[in-house]
Amino acid sequence: MSQEHPEQGSSSKRRVYPQQQYDFAAAQPAGYSMPDPTQPYGASASPSAAMYGGAHAIPSPAAFQPHTANVQSGAFAPPPGTPGSAVDPPVAPGVAGGMAYGAPQAAGAAYGYQGLTNQMGNLNIGGGGAYQGGAPPGAAGGAHMAAPTQLNQIYNTDLLQNFPPPISDLTLPPPPVILPPGSSVTGNPDPNADSEFMRCTLNTVPTSSSLLKKSKLPFALVIRPYTALRDADENVPTVADTTIARCRRCRSYINPYVVFLEGGARWRCNMCNLTNDVPSGFDYDAVANKPRDRWSRAELNHSVVEFVAPAEYMVRPPQPLVYVFVLDVSVHSVKNGLLATAARTIKESLSRIPNVDNRTRVGFLAVDSSLHYFAIPRKEDVAEGEGEEGEENEWPEPRMMVVSDIDDPFLPMPTDLLVNLSQCKGGIEKLLDSLQSMFAHTVNPASALGSAVVAAHKLIANIGGKIVCLTSTLPNVGQGKLEVRDDKKALGTSREGQMLQTASTFYKSFAVECSKTQVTVDMFLFSSHYQDVASLSNLPRFSAGQTYFYPGWIASNPEDANKFALEFSEYLSQELATEAVLRVRSCDGIRMSAFYGNFFSRSSDLCSFSTFPRDQSYVIEVNIEETIVKPWVTFQAAILHSTASGERRIRVITRAFPTSALLQDIYASADQIAITTYLANKAVEKALQKGPQDARDLLMNRLNEMFTCYKKDLMTTNVGASAPLQFCTNLRMLPLLVNALIKHIGFRKTSQIPSDLRSAALCLLSTLPDKYLIQYIYPNFYNLIFMPDEAGLPDAETGQIVMPPCTNLSGEHLISHGLFLIDDGQVMFLWVGRDAQPALLQDVFGVSSITEVPTGKTELPVLDNQFNERIRNIISKAREKTDAITYQHLYVVREDGEPALRLWATTHLVEDRVEQSGVTYHQFLTSIREKLNS
């Protein structure tokens, strides 16, 4: 049904339901109003206060000074007509010059201005005759010192008085990174990398380790090198001339924050201050055979660039992409339909596998108590003169060879086990068509998965690539065999931590061997029984892979089969970087101290990735070892990798952050989303080492330390026990997120969560990019009957479906006549109130009674009315992603329906009591206040 977007202020045509059921104001609890997503941080702190983002105290602009020095007249003369007027520095949202609201004494006159004066004295901007030759358009002509830059102001908010928390804050960008004018060499108003690529827990960096320690805030980077599954969905500029300028000492790459010296012949590194020669080809276009405009080079204008690397960056020529599929053919995988569904999905996705240069290779290995190898015929083996070449019925039958020695597996033949995808596509399709019939009558319950992975590794060790394991059986024979250890009596006790650790050293040690030979292992696990996810997930964790868990999966359920087929097809289609390493550099006195994520640590500062996934992020903890004297510091992540098309490239991500010696500056620029991501990774580490209880204690202790520091050093006066709970506005969602983490399935105190589910959750918590991690911790909660008229319809300008606003995750909003959607990014629940009106049920489900509403895993029917279409559009939009493979299941939950399903849905309402957690979010905040004042 085609829909027109209603004009602003008008209502679209829709069925009229009883007024009391669909009146927004009538349904909300007293005193509650929907948060306004357009409000800046701090908007609810005080109507008259200087808001985080207020415009009344913005410092006056200073002229831009190009970041160059030591001019030599006549060199790189600017072309005629180059503007010479000053450029106003960018004013980021949230810059305010007045006293900090709520803490006038703490933010005295020296705050933000005089506190930076001495730092700015160290900033070499223009003094001594700046190099003006070839200055970028818009650069100022005079040499002078720019005015000190005002940093973010700190604003207090009362967490208990301003309740419930405004969850629209979760979608706001991080606090602005405010750099001094002229910090960019080209005058680009926004040279910093987007926070989607790199964000820091502290957007103002403390100048000393003592200040960092005093703040109790974590100092870490959250890095996501790729923001889309495919290059076409990214917009990263490429430097293709292989002219790469790097510092001779620290090996950092030239970027928008360097300084050109001596008439542009040399450049000063912004990391270590060493002066380097500019490469001879830097100002020359070898392709067009003419000089180039230096200031148009991508690496001087953009902080995320990709260099095409010359031959010296290669240890060996880029290898082809290789996929080896290890398929479980034991009786359980045959009966639940995994083998047939996997074979069909692989066949349908062969054309989606990256194969730009026709070099991609594939192989197949089936496993039960033996190993089944398949020799696939090549195109030249097809008989000539028997029809058109490539027809499926012209390909010879693949040969199967069985190896029963699972303790020391070997390759039964040297060739034809790993074949070219383009040359052998017909033979591959023929094999995939026949796999189900080959093992249809098996009764073998055993699985030698560990031995199969060893055999697959032998097959591709000299090339590298991916081993893709699809299994629904606990590995119970051969190398790395496991036993059932799902002790329900241990759940929720101190012994539960042992069940989250690997039961066999094989899976970690062999993952390290895989990483050394550029092999990644990905696990797709399907079972209604115990599968020891804790042990099996070690293979992906230390080989830069991922664990995908499908509990209770069965192909006869269309929703299960559809979810796996969609996700696996997306997985196969994502573009891969291979033979990759990641190194993060920064200024003198700053060191990367700890790394979190799925990879192999080759050295203290080098992370190795056999293949670089597109849907994961990484956390890097930072130490300050020396006092920082610079007015700003720079972090640079470099990823050396090979592309699927056979090019060696370096993706470079650079971000600069101001520094300060004032505690209030550090708190005012702290990023609550990045801090939560860091805490989640630390809690996962603690849970895997000690258990969920220790993880919960870690989260609670870190939060209490921040509140204690804030009260002691940043609150205006010492107040009594009846005082409110104050915190800085830009961190006001941090307690909510920590509360949600403590109640999350990965850490929650309960005896009802199987260890496999908890282990799979820990895998996600340690790898999800921050926007999906926050949603996984604090799900999106939509009220589908009290939503704007435009929600669920295409936007008139963008054509994108408009989503309804989110509301707080509390059961007080689950009105009995309502319809609600809970979405944590992995699963969705459509909640139907027990008193839902027949007209609503008819429009959404096509039934007239609540008892007729189908519950459980399902999809909405397609009905000929606008409300049904809007709900389906919202669900489809929630599933729409270009940077992840996840396709959420939809569970319909009736308020008066199955108790287990209802309980599962309500555990996502993390502002309420959840199982044994025992406290609401309001009580959680009250307990923090009592602890502070005790």
Swiss-Prot record:
Pfam families: Gelsolin, Sec23_BS, Sec23_helical, Sec23_trunk, zf-Sec23_Sec24. The keyword Metal-binding applies. Its main location: cytoplasm. GO terms for biological process: COPII-coated vesicle cargo loading; intracellular protein transport. Zn(2+) binds at residues 247, 250, 269, 272. It is found in: Cytoplasm; Cytoplasmic vesicle, COPII-coated vesicle membrane; Endoplasmic reticulum membrane; Golgi apparatus membrane. The keyword Transport applies. Residues 247-272 are annotated as: Zinc finger-like. GO terms for cellular component: cis-Golgi network; COPII vesicle coat; endoplasmic reticulum exit site; endoplasmic reticulum membrane; equatorial cell cortex; Golgi membrane. It comes from the Eukaryota. Gene3D superfamilies: beta-sandwich domain of Sec23/24, Sec23/Sec24 helical domain, Severin, von Willebrand factor, type A domain, Zn-finger domain of Sec23/24. Keywords: Cytoplasm, Cytoplasmic vesicle, Endoplasmic reticulum, ER-Golgi transport, Golgi apparatus, Membrane, Metal-binding, Protein transport, Transport, Zinc. GO terms for molecular function: SNARE binding; zinc ion binding. Coiled coil: none annotated. Residues 1-56, 70-89 are annotated as: Disordered. It is a peripheral membrane protein. Belongs to the SEC23/SEC24 family. SEC24 subfamily. Component of the coat protein complex II (COPII) which promotes the formation of transport vesicles from the endoplasmic reticulum (ER). The coat has two main functions, the physical deformation of the endoplasmic reticulum membrane into vesicles and the selection of cargo molecules. The COPII coat is composed of at least 5 proteins: the SEC23/24 complex, the SEC13/31 complex, and the protein SAR1. Golgi apparatus membrane; Peripheral membrane protein; Cytoplasmic side. This is Protein transport protein SEC24.
